[in-house]
């Protein structure tokens, strides 16, 4: 990947984060996520990163892909960043296990 930061660059970064989450959460249960602070931090960081990169996509790109819940991605980042100590791990777990794989399929 070159250093040109355009829509393709940001989509590749988003895909990398989504794939990382899907691979590393594959066999993880809620109890393991709850007990593993390093795993929590890693997953939350990836969720923040994919949201940050989604914000950098052009409006044209996002409008062409209206089925992707862009606003939900931005809201996710804001909830994590602004209320980090009070993030509901049940909601995070459901997002990681259900929404993230669906989003990856939508973006592929």
Predicted regions and their residues:
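Solvent-exposed interaction patches of small proteins and small membrane subunits
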Residues: 1-108
């Amino acid at each position: 990947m070159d250093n040109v930061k355009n829509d393709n660059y940001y989509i590749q970064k988003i895909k990398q984060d989504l794939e990382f989450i899907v691979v590393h959460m594959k066999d993880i249960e809620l109890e393991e996520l709850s007990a593993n602070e390093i795993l929590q931090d890693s997953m939350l960081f990836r969720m923040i990163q994919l949201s940050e990169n989604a914000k950098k996509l052009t409006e044209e790109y996002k409008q062409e892909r209206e089925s992707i819940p862009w606003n939900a991605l931005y809201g996710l980042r804001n909830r994590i960043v602004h209320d980090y100590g009070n993030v509901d791990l049940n909601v995070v777990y459901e997002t990681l296990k259900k929404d993230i794989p669906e989003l990856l399929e939508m973006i592929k």
